């Protein structure tokens, strides 16, 4: 489908507006990825180059999918977490099939993604678990034993990203894990 010349600038403006509405940490992380891609290309490091290209493609697809909603570093952390989980599943499959060469490649990619994930200014899994435990302990002392849906109802979801320094999905999973552990 061909686009008329008047529509092209509007699409470019929307993409720039979305990216400028993103958090500074998100913008810095993308710039760092692009800079590392250039370095990997110059160093002819194929593993790093393909991994970074994969990251950038996944991020771009997420930007396209979430059209009008600007992404932030929490969304980037969720993307990285999903990619690390995919690598872990691939490693398990390759180990079952005796493909040690592919296991090593996937492990290198996973370590690289984890390094980028660690550079993001978000709460670690340990910090989230401690915060979730404290939150549940406080709820039990004030309201008694509550079922998980009522625990979720006590969370201030509009401000959870800033309060907990994590994405709502990460907070939800940390609370569920802490609830399961305490039950």
From Swiss-Prot:
Record's GO cellular component terms: mitochondrion
MF terms (GO), sorted A to Z: carbon-nitrogen ligase activity, with glutamine as amido-N-donor
InterPro entries assigned to the protein according to its UniProt record, in alphabetical order: Asn/Gln_tRNA_amidoTrase-B-like, YqeY/Aim41, YqeY/Aim41_N
Locations listed in the record: Mitochondrion
Keywords per UniProt: Mitochondrion, Transit peptide
Major location category of this protein: mitochondrion
Transit peptide: 1-20
Alphabetized PANTHER family for the sequence: ALTERED INHERITANCE OF MITOCHONDRIA PROTEIN 41, MITOCHONDRIAL
Family: Belongs to the AIM41 family.
Protein name: Altered inheritance of mitochondria protein 41, mitochondrial
Organism in which the protein naturally occurs: Eremothecium gossypii (strain ATCC 10895 / CBS 109.51 / FGSC 9923 / NRRL Y-1056) (Yeast)
Classification of source organism: Eukaryota, Fungi, Dikarya, Ascomycota, Saccharomycotina
Gene that this sequence comes from: AIM41
